[in-house]
Amino acid sequence: MKNKFGKESRLYIRAKVSDGKTCLQDSYFTAPFKIAKPFYEGHGGFMNLMVMSASAGVMEGDNYRIEVELDKGARVKLEGQSYQKIHRMKNGTAVQYNSFTLADGAFLDYAPNPTIPFADSAFYSNTECRMEEGSAFIYSEILAAGRVKSGEIFRFREYHSGIKIYYGGELIFLENQFLFPKVQNLEGIGFFEGFTHQASMGFFCKQISDELIDKLCVMLTAMEDVQFGLSKTKKYGFVVRILGNSSDRLESILKLIRNILY
């Protein structure tokens, strides 16, 4: 089934450093994508880009493709305007592919808003990030069990989120998360374990210290309303997963982690 736009929906962004400041070198988008004017706030020297959508949410047949290229030393935070609502679907699916390319010294923080999969929805997302020496990459995701406040919990059809990360041409991280409520007990052990929201975050760069991991563990352990797991990857990174009962709460925790990272 084709989406209402009749074609793949694309967003392309390229950023560079000019006079010591990250700026937008090139951009291109098709419906429903739009991007707001870049803005600069906070610390870290990031150019903040907000991705907007003219659609009410993700619909059956939607096919999204986001490509980001960062030149040497560019620092970009890419975030969404509002929650990503994945609407009910008859028989089809919706897909999204993200491609990120980071040159030497570049830093991308990919921070989409929380995702809410409605009943009978099916969504497939794949992300590929290619990092050159000296670059850094953060990704995060918050997934709700559904429209929780309406009592719609784990009634989506399928949800898939996959990510591959390459550093200097070497595959250093691969993860695939498949959620199928009809065949999996998503409220049980190994899944949401009685919680309604899940946050995931990964940070990848060559300098990941044990002191950083210890600091994050101490901070998260002190939070009694969530459960978490944090592990260093085989090379150049760590991943943390947090279970809670509120998107706002998990967003605030991810913000605290980011404040430690940069």
Curated annotation (Swiss-Prot):
Q: Which domain of life is it from?
A: Bacteria
Gene that produces this protein: ureD
Q: Which GO terms describe its cellular component?
A: cytoplasm
* Subcellular location(s) of the protein: Cytoplasm
Q: Which UniProt keywords apply?
A: Chaperone, Cytoplasm, Nickel insertion
Q: What does this protein do?
A: Required for maturation of urease via the functional incorporation of the urease nickel metallocenter.
Pfam families on file: UreD
Q: What is this protein called?
A: Urease accessory protein UreD
Q: Which InterPro entries match?
A: UreD
Q: How is the quaternary structure described?
A: UreD, UreF and UreG form a complex that acts as a GTP-hydrolysis-dependent molecular chaperone, activating the urease apoprotein by helping to assemble the nickel containing metallocenter of UreC. The UreE protein probably delivers the nickel.
Gene Ontology molecular function, alphabetical: nickel cation binding
User: Which family, according to the similarity comment?
Assistant: Belongs to the UreD family.
